[in-house]
């Protein structure tokens, strides 16, 4: 495990993406095992079922894979862009479920993904020029 971490580029954005990816893996596993934590996000728990939970789990796993890959290939502009897109999509999803579809209420289950995605969007935009050598 330490050898894998040693191969990580010397970038706080890369390290952040690894942390977020590991957290997403936990979320993926729990999505397949039980809808309990997913129900903490959405206010209409009748809409949260096994199928929805597993679909959410696959979406979360895909995001984790992209972010983990980005952590190790942080200087590749295409990979960096795709990683940024995962955070924009997550932010859009949770904000639209809250503000547009009204399927969730403002609370810890919603705040966590909104804060993580927003901070990640800001952090990646802020560091983009220094990591890629291009304008944000």
Curated annotation (Swiss-Prot):
The chain crosses the membrane at residues 18-34, 56-72, 79-95, 109-125. GO terms for molecular function: protein-macromolecule adaptor activity; protein-membrane adaptor activity. Its main location: endoplasmic reticulum. It is a multi-pass membrane protein. One of its GO terms (biological process) is ergosterol biosynthetic process. Pathway: Steroid metabolism; ergosterol biosynthesis. Keywords: Endoplasmic reticulum, Lipid biosynthesis, Lipid metabolism, Membrane, Steroid biosynthesis, Steroid metabolism, Sterol biosynthesis, Sterol metabolism, Transmembrane, Transmembrane helix. It is found in: Endoplasmic reticulum membrane. One of its GO terms (cellular component) is endoplasmic reticulum membrane. InterPro entries: Erg28. Heterotetramer of erg25, erg26, erg27 and erg28. Erg28 acts as a scaffold to tether erg27 and other 4,4-demethylation-related enzymes, forming a demethylation enzyme complex, in the endoplasmic reticulum. Belongs to the ERG28 family. Part of the third module of ergosterol biosynthesis pathway that includes by the late steps of the pathway. The third module or late pathway involves the ergosterol synthesis itself through consecutive reactions that mainly occur in the endoplasmic reticulum (ER) membrane. Firstly, the squalene synthase erg9 catalyzes the condensation of 2 farnesyl pyrophosphate moieties to form squalene, which is the precursor of all steroids. In Aspergillus, the biosynthesis pathway of the sterol precursors leading to the prevalent sterol ergosterol differs from yeast. The ringsystem of lanosterol in S.cerevisiae is firstly demethylised in three enzymatic steps leading to the intermediate zymosterol and secondly a methyl group is added to zymosterol by the sterol 24-C-methyltransferase to form fecosterol. In Aspergillus, lanosterol is firstly transmethylated by the sterol 24-C-methyltransferase leading to the intermediate eburicol and secondly demethylated in three steps to form fecosterol. PANTHER family: ERGOSTEROL BIOSYNTHETIC PROTEIN 28 HOMOLOG, ERGOSTEROL BIOSYNTHETIC PROTEIN 28-RELATED. This is Ergosterol biosynthetic protein 28. It comes from Schizosaccharomyces pombe (strain 972 / ATCC 24843).
């Amino acid at each position: 495990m330490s050898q894998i971490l040693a191969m990580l580029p010397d970038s706080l954005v890369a390290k952040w993406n690894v942390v977020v990816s590991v957290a997403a893996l936990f979320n993926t596993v729990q999505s397949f095992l039980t809808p309990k934590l997913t129900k903490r996000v959405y206010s209409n728990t009748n809409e949260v079922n096994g199928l929805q939970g597993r679909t959410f789990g696959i979406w979360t796993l895909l995001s984790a894979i992209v972010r983990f890959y980005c952590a190790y290939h942080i200087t590749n502009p295409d990979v960096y862009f795709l990683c940024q897109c995962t955070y924009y999509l997550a932010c859009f999803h949770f904000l639209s479920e809250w503000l547009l579809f009204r399927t969730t209420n403002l609370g810890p289950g919603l705040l966590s993904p909104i804060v993580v995605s927003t901070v990640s969007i800001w952090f990646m935009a802020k560091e983009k020029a220094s990591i890629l050598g291009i304008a944000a």
